[in-house]
UniProtKB/Swiss-Prot annotation:
GO terms for molecular function: RNA binding; structural constituent of ribosome. InterPro entries: Ribosomal_Su5_D2-typ_SF, Ribosomal_uS9, Ribosomal_uS9_bac/plastid, Ribosomal_uS9_CS, Ribsml_uS5_D2-typ_fold_subgr. One of its GO terms (biological process) is translation. GO terms for cellular component: cytosolic small ribosomal subunit. Keywords: Ribonucleoprotein, Ribosomal protein. Disulfide bonds: none annotated. This is Small ribosomal subunit protein uS9. The lineage of its organism: Bacteria, Pseudomonadati, Pseudomonadota, Gammaproteobacteria, Enterobacterales.
Length: 130
């Protein structure tokens, strides 16, 4: 591959994304498909583009991404985290700007496990007094 390529790993919920960045003209490829083909929802596309728009690099970099696991929002969040890490590897001076926007911190929230005797993680069975 390219010699001037930068890499970042992103994770969110049950998703993990590997992001490769190289100078180009703004092409985003996710699992061999375009951004528009991969994410049907506009909100997911916006989440993916956020770090690039913040640092004005939308038209300057090509992104090659592989993502596994989780659902749509988890994958979009993992990609955003991966892009952020790759951008910091590309140019360390972008870190403070990305940190201010909250993209550097890994969102550690996970689905809470279902407990025995409950219907869901916290939802109790209906209580009948009589």
């Amino acid at each position: 591959m390219a010699e001037n390529q930068y890499y970042g790993t992103g994770r969110r919920k049950n998703s993990a994304a590997r992001v490769f960045i190289k100078p180009g003209n703004g092409k985003i490829v996710i699992n061999q498909r375009s951004l528009e083909q991969y994410f049907g929802r506009e909100t997911a596309r916006m989440v993916v583009r956020q770090p690039l728009e913040l640092v004005d690099m939308v038209e300057k970099l090509d992104l090659y991404i592989t993502v596994k696991g989780g659902g749509i929002s988890g994958q979009a969040g993992a990609i955003r985290h991966g892009i952020t890490r790759a951008l910091m590897e590309y140019d360390e001076s972008l870190r403070s700007e990305l940190r201010k926007a909250g993209f550097v911190t890994r969102d550690a929230r996970q689905v809470e496990r279902k407990k025995v005797g409950l219907r869901k993680a916290r939802r109790r069975p209906q209580f009948s007094k009589r």
